[in-house]
Regions:
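Generic structural motif recognizing short loop/turn segments at the entrances and edges of beta-strands
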Residues: 1, 22-24, 36-40, 191
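Generic short beta-strand segments
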Residues: 27-30, 162
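A broadly tuned "polar low-complexity/structure-edge" signature
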Residues: 12, 17, 38-40, 153, ...
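Short, flexible active-site-adjacent loop segments at beta-strand->alpha-helix junctions, enriched
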Residues: 23, 30, 59
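Short, small-residue-biased leader/transition segments that mark boundaries at the very start
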Residues: 2-7
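Extended, compositionally simple hydrophobic/Ser/Thr-rich segments
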Residues: 42-44, 49-198
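Solvent-exposed adhesion/ligand-recognition segments of exported proteins
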Residues: 9, 14-21, 26
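An anionic, turn-rich surface loop/hairpin at beta-sheet edges
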Residues: 29-42, 144
Length: 198
């Protein structure tokens, strides 16, 4: 056994996994404040009961199978990463504080919120999509086809979308929206915001 094996066993002693009210939480014991670069893997079976994912503080969540739900939500913050595939009636995707989400989504409706230099990459499709981006956040959804799409960007945020029917695009404060697809457009630009075809 190498030092790496000993370190992993020691780290596992401080992993706290709790199930409360239908929510599974995996964290490092709050009394420990000197762990750095700890790599802990928690495996959860995808038995059809996963409805939400929440990652923070540089944690990473990845899925090997498509997660099915009527309503699904994912939220990444503080440099966390989420990489999953989802099939749902409605899907909510939120990222903040330099976090990253890479998701394949098949949904009737999809809502996206991103802020503070976070990045969301989507592929798949939805009948309706709404996106709100601010503070240098990025949405890369050129491979995510939405029939109806409403996008609002501000404060140097950037969005790339693919819309086939109706697009409402509102860009302000140095932000930008680029779109593809044969869609009717309603465009508002202010304070250095830009909207254009990709």
């Amino acid at each position: 056994r190498g030092l790496g094996d000993v370190y992993k066993r020691q780290v596992m002693d401080y992993v706290v996994v709790e199930a409360k009210g239908g929510r599974l939480t995996a964290t490092i014991d709050k009394s420990i404040n000197n762990l750095s670069n700890a790599d802990v893997t928690v495996t959860v079976p995808a038995n059809g009961s996963i409805r939400a994912l929440d990652a923070s503080s540089a944690a990473k969540i990845s899925g090997d199978v498509v997660l099915n739900a009527d309503k699904f939500a994912m939220d990444a913050s503080s440099a966390a990463k989420i990489d999953v595939s989802v099939k749902a009636q409605s899907c909510a995707v939120a990222a903040s504080s330099a976090s990253k989400i890479n998701a394949s989504v098949e949904a009737v409706s999809c809502s996206v919120e991103a802020s503070s230099a976070s990045k969301i990459t989507l592929k798949g499709s939805a009948a309706k999509c709404t996106a709100d981006l601010s503070s240098a956040a990025k949405l890369s959804a050129g491979d995510f086809v939405a029939a109806e799409c409403s996008v609002n960007t501000s404060s140097a945020a950037k969005a790339v979308v693919n819309c086939t029917e109706r697009l409402h695009a509102d860009a302000s404060s140095g932000s930008s929206i680029r779109y593809s697809g044969d869609c009717q457009t309603s465009i508002n630009k202010s304070s250095g915001g830009s909207v254009g075809r990709n």
